[in-house]
Amino acid sequence: MTTKASIIRRPAVAGQFYPGYPDELRSSVDEYLAGAVKSGPDPVALISPHAGYVFSGHVAAQAFKQAEGVDYDAIVVLGTNHTDPMARGCAIWPEGAFAMPMGDVPIDSQLARALMEADSRITFQRSAHQAEHSIEVQLPFLQRVQPGKKFVPIIVAEPTRENCEALARALASTLRERRALVVASSDLSHYPRYEDAVRVDHASLAAVVSLDPLALQASIEDSMGGGIHDLHTCMCGEGPVMTTML
């Protein structure tokens, strides 16, 4: 099937956050994955960073290694909004594909439509995706551990509790009968000194491990209100992570 050019999302950060040439990118991702270890049961959700690969590629590889070879029939990648101040609710890309150096990653349009029908907050917002990197940087790893698979990209544009709960309900209802993987794209603290970053990140991760969204919210509020110098955020993908926990 030929995909309409108008709904192909072009890469925004190829050659910046990750290698822009197919062979170089494939080699880089495979090298990161070769250094990762599969350490538990097949996951239903992952948290993966979205910084440049030179900074966080080894962490992303450890996350995606857990999904290598698992036969998922639905994949959703949740990103955060760095680039579009006008984006609202949850911004989905409902059909077509994301063009990438190693080839297009097709959209699961049937699942995307079901999610849009499940909640009116989930809408197609082209501008929210065009320059955003938080989903794009996950895709080379996804292409290597789940080759040929379709996916649904959603940016949690306004990460309010209400929006996260609505998206979580929509995901739960549409994925209930499927073997699904949800990838939450998030970095951790920006930009405190090392000692403070370790403390803040440990607190955030402990809350994530508890699987208690309220604990995560409280941890972030406590850290942000603690007067830590140069702490701009505890978790820039709070919306994707919160949604996944819910």
Where are these regions (language model features)?
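Active-site histidine-anchored catalytic micro-motif
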Residues: 3-242
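A conserved acidic, glycine/proline-rich C-terminal tail/linker
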Residues: 244-246
